[in-house]
């Protein structure tokens, strides 16, 4: 008869920033595809957490990019902005680590409200080793919110200048 074995494990720290009231995240993996802290990541990175989004009232991804060091925004039409870093256009944009194609006319996918995102991870510099082909500008990873263990409901409303208003649930 075989002896009894006990197996135990801890859940991987996913780096969820919602509800943490923190301006940093314990782990991010956009730069190396490994769950490393920002301090352990060997590239220039910025993480915009849910708390910072709420505190600074960053409603759109454009608002987030305006508050990110090293990112320049150029207008390429009405509601079609292009993000640039280090003199190059940022073409490397991912949702939860999966690449998306912005196509010829900008990024309609980038017009979404920030309510669905937990955090935005920006890696400045060449990310071709881990992201595939690209230019030496930056890589942007939009990390969506994850379901919680307990039921959770929130309703937020906002209003501002320039016909800026909305409601999220």
Give the role of each language-model region:
Residues 3-150:
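Acidic, small-polar-rich N-terminal luminal/periplasmic segments of exported/outer-membrane proteins
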Residues 143-169:
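Short strand-turn segments of transmembrane beta-barrel domains in outer membranes
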